[in-house]
Every structure is written in C-alpha cells, then in structure tokens.
C-alpha cells in the first residue's frame, strides 16, 4: 500500500514537471496614456516543459482581450523572455477610452503543451497641457473701432483634459502685455484706453498664455486691429480687370488679388473689407485681403460654362463693416479648358457575332459611334485609337485607316478551318482609345468576335441507298441495319432520324422502327415473306439547318416458317367393324397447303391414338392430297382390340426427303389434324325386314370461334341484355297494374255446386265455384290478354265483360254424373276461367245442362251467384264432345 502511494506521488510530480508555465503571469501592468508605439508594459518569461521543447514561433501571443483592442502585442526579447508593448494602432486616452484591459496570453511549444494566463493593463492618467479650441488655436484677428470705449474685447477659452473634467479653473495671462490691453485670470481681454488710429495705434499683437494646475501651459496669438473711422471712398489699386483661370482648380486656390487703399488710412490697405456682391458659387473673396479663391470645382465641360466660359463678378470694398465709405469694381474670369476627361466609350466590351463567310474588307465595328471625349475644346476633346492587339487577331482584323477605330475583317473566318478551330473560333481584339493631348489619358476597349457557323455543306448519307436483308423468322426488336448521315459543317448538331414513308403492312401501320439518335433500323413485329417480300422505306435525317432523305430497301428472306394447313382440320368418321382392309374410310381425303413449301414436301404420320396401327394415310409422303385407309382388321372377339372410339392426332410435316430438295432444311414446320373415328359393332338384334345391314354416317359439325367474328357474340350478348331489360320492364308494369286494380282483400266462400259423379273415362274431379258479384260496376278497363273492355266494381273487385258475347248453347240434360267439374282455384282470375277445358260426358247425346254450375270468381276468391254469371264466361267454358262420339 505504501509503495502505491509513493508511485502516485512520483507520477504527480512528473506530470507537474512536464507543464509549460508563463512566469510572472498573471500580473498587472501600468502604461501611461498617449504612450508612443513600443512602450514596454510588462515583461515575463516562459518556463519550458520537461521535454524542453521550444516555443512555437509566433507564441506567446495575445489571443483575446477585454475590451477588444489592438493596442498591445507581445515582443520577443531573448531566449524565453518576452515583453508586452504598445502597438500605436489605438490611442490610449485615460479620459475618453477604457482604463483597464485584460489580455489573455497564450503559449504553446512544439509538442503541444500549452499555457494561458491573463495580464491586466491599467492606463494611468498623465497631466496634459491645456489646448485652445478651433480657430483660436491657430491665432485670431480681432478688430476694434478706434475711439471705442475701454472695456471687453474678447473672451479667450481653453480646454484641459484633467482640470476641465475636475472643474479646476485655468489661468490666463498676456505675455508682454501692452499698456492698452489687460486680461483677467478667467481669460477676458479688456482694453484699458481709448485707441486712436491716427495716433499710430493701428494694430496690436498679443500673446495669450494659459496654465493648468500642474503648471503646464499653452499659448496663442491675438491680432487686435484698430478700425479707422474715415470719410474717404476707398480706391482700387489693382490694374487687372480680366483674369484667366483653368478649370478643375482645387478649392481655395487664389485666382486674383483685389487691392484698394483708403485715403484716410494711407499705407494700410488691409484695413479695408472686401466682398463679392454678385451671386457666384465658384469664387469667394477674403474680406480682409481681397484675395479671390476658388470656392468649388469649376467644370468647363458641364453646365452653362460649356457654352459661355466667362464669369463676371462685382467686388465691393468698404472701410467699415457697417456704414462708412465703399467702392465697387467689375472683374471678369475666363475659364480655360484643360484635358481632364479621358476618352471614354458607352461600353468598353463589345461582343460581335460574325458569319463565317463574311467577305474580307467588311466593316465589323466603328468605335467612333460609341466613344467620345467630354472636354469642350480642341485638342483636349480629340482622341485616336491604337493598333489592335490580341492573340490571333493580327492576321484576321485590322484598323483601317489606322487610328480611325474602324475594325475591318482582313482574314479568313472559316469555321471548319483547323487554325480557326484551334482558336475556338473566338477572337479578342484589344484597342486603346487615348487623347491626343497631354496627359494622354487612355482606356482599353475589348472586342470579342465570335464566328457564327453557316450551313455550307448539305446533310448527306454515307450511301446513296441502303439494302438490308432480314429473315422472316426474326422476332421484334431485331436489328435490320443502320443508316448514317453526316454534315461537314461545324459544330456538329444532333441528327434525328425518322421514317417518312413506307414500312406499313395490312395489320401494322409501322413494321419498322428507327432509333432517332443512332439511325438503327429495327423490327416492330415479325414480317412475312409470303405477304410482303420487300419493303421500301424513305428515311429522313434532320438537324437544325438541313434535311436529307435516303431510300432503304429491306428484303425479307424466305424461310420455312409456315405450318402446313390441311382441310378438314378436324373430322368425325364412322366405320363398321368388319370393314375391308385397304378401304378408304368414308372416302376421307386430306388436302394440305403450305405457303413456303412445295406440294411434294409433305409427310404424314399418325401420332397418339392409332392403337394397334389400324389406320394409315396413302400416300404418306410426297403429295399434298392423301387418303385415310384401314390397314388391319379389328379383332374385338379375340380381345386384341378393346377401343371402339379412336382419337387420331395426325402430324403433317413439310420435310419430305422424297421431294425435289436434296436434304431436309434446318427449319421444319408441322401441322396437325384431329380425327375422331367410331367403330360400329355388329347389331345384337337381327331385323328380318332389313334385307342387308346399313351403315349410318354421322357428320359431326363443330362451331369454332374465330377472332375475326368478334361482333357475333357481342351482338348476341347485347340483344340478350336488351331483351331481358324489356321483359323486366313489362313485369314491373304488370305488377303495378295488378296492384292498382286489386286493392281489396275478400274472404273465401266456396260451395260445391254439383255432386261428384263417376264415369269410365273420368281422370280427375273439377269443382266449379262461383263468385257473388255486386251488380254495380263503376269502372272500366281493358283486358291485357284479349284487348277487350270489361267493367269492374271498385269495392268488391267483381268484373264482367262490357259487351256480352254469344250465349253458350244449351245442351239437353241427360245425366249429371258424367260431368267432371274442374276446380278453379281462388288465385286464378278471368284468364283461368277463359282457358279452362271441360271434358265431355262419355254418354253420347247427353250434354251439359244450362245450369251446369259454371261460375266466375272475383279477385277476392268468393264464389259468385250462378244467376249473375257472365254469358261470356259461359260461352268460353262450355264442354266439348269427344271426337268420334
């Protein structure tokens, strides 16, 4: 345990010894305000880490500061000693700026060990001398009218950064003060005596000194001028009345000096006051000296000065600011033009598209239309153009005449020329436009000339026509061939291929498809040589400028792709079991055709179903017509044969080697025929009346659906749907009619009207019921079956025919036992009564009695009174005598 503690202590000591340290940091340093650059603020050193790796150059450095400043940097002294100094990039002002700066100093050695410490810099206040503000710092002219009462003249004010901020007053003094002036401690200038101009007191030069609490001082000059009072008009002494000035003179430039003198103050013209009475924005005059200066920029080339370069001024001179004597004079300034505007152009970059077949000598660009010089007078407003320059432009373009700015084509711009292609058919012409007068201002004009290609060469195919062969067995998307068109014009534009005419069949509008980009011709569907052996296409190639077409002939190569087709394709045959061998069964003949094979190329064979090989075809090869023969007898008695119904699948192949072909081709097609053969056994019962056995031939006809007759099932289906809809509609109408005319529900009152009787021929009993009917019929309707009109009772539902028919004939009653009455159920209506069949009594001569009990039934099912029977019902339901009775 003790060893572990010692080991941890050693590791801690080693890790601490490996650290990189900034010595004498963190710390606080002081620097005086307004210190010059390079002033030392604080010195420190770097203790290297245990690896003794040196500090990376550029470190230590100040990585951050609060507040942010660039007023300090770290300088290397020697070895591992450094110091923080001022940079002079920012003014350190105790009164106006921050007083304390926290600088983060970062150091890093070559192995990556780092340290970061903070240096706090305090800006210390320094006593600064006081300062005069404004014009007072440069000296000031003061004017006092002669004979003015002694007293206040001027209040002098100065500023001291330290004392002013602490409200400590400054002390003002006059150095070597004359006896006529005195200054108070607060800076007030007083005159002590009345000043007389004529006595020689014309001006006084005073030096004012100000001192702060620290004894620092500053001084300025005061020129006190005594203004003379006089009654003489000042006289101008300057002889010049017209002045010439150049444009673009700097403001403040003296362009004229107007002088005058006052007889009252002879020899002291500076006491006069000058002014310009004319409104002018270009000139100003010193009111004391009479010097005229430029007030603002004078541009000879703009505004009214471009047309009239003269400026007239009226100068006023007077001997006192207010009142007194004055005089006026007219002076004129003529503004002369200087070459201050370079030749310029509306634009300095031109892009010209020139067709490649442009003739030599063609004017491409006239720069005179775009370039100008704003100077107003010659030669300042004149300019010319230098020789054109630019890679590859010297042999193609020229300025003609020289210096005219007219660029003329002198070379060849053929787009397909190799040298022009190497240049990219793009040319840069650089021309300088410059003044002809000093200082020869110039500007570069860049002219980019691009050659536009023209359609010089036609679009042609690499062959005048194309012939392609394709097998008729090839599937869709098979490549037939490829056409290619070229255009020698550059740049190459994309070509689009299309089939303009041809390539159609009876079933397909387009048998071929061409790739619009590559010109590859492909099949859209399989082709048939027997239908169309040759296709002639017109293929068109188009680019942006031209169109060309070529004829393409596609030969369809014939191959054995058609199956033999035989008639009939299926058939039903019947033969007696004892048919003679070699007999043509039912004279059956098979006729076959093949569109791509000769009649001698057929070979016939019977596949599954020919059990015991009873059947064969003759001939079995070399002919398109063959017959079905019986090759061996049937043996059902011996058990050799057991099948009576044969299903033969006949194969018809077009590879007969006995035909005119020397060998079988690679492609062989096989057709099939289905035969159904029924063997008729010997009859089990011998009919003596039949002199000889007969064979009944049964012909089986089978309807086979053909896709071309699609309309037949469609019409049948549509007609069935319409008929079914019509029947449903009629049933709905009938149901509505029954519901409308049968609103009542009546009870049943069934009574048998006759006794049951039996006869020899009677098979069933018929009970005739009658319905009691209301004699009041208040409605009429038409019977939907017969179309006749009947009357009905709206309450009971009873009905009767409106127009009675002929009454039933009355039969003499012979017996009531022969009547076999038929029961009319309650659900039957008029139609049931009308359609009832009555059986006649077997006894001859007897007939139904007049009141045989035939009645009618209303809709409620009640039996009616026989007295109210409708004669029409009786007429329709009388018994019929049996034939032969």
Curated annotation (Swiss-Prot):
Residues 23-132, 136-236, 237-344, 346-466, 462-566, 567-695 form the Cadherin domain. The chain crosses the membrane at residues 714-734. Changing residue 100 to A: Complete loss of interaction with human rhinovirus C. Keywords: Asthma, Calcium, Cell adhesion, Cell membrane, Glycoprotein, Host cell receptor for virus entry, Host-virus interaction, Membrane, Receptor, Repeat, Signal, Transmembrane, Transmembrane helix. It is linked to Asthma susceptibility may be associated with variants affecting the gene represented in this entry in early childhood asthma with severe exacerbations occurring between 2 and 6 years of age. (Microbial infection) Interacts (via N-terminus) with human rhinovirus C capsid proteins VP1, VP2 and VP3. This is Cadherin-related family member 3. It comes from Homo sapiens (Human). The lineage of its organism: Eukaryota, Metazoa, Chordata, Craniata, Vertebrata.
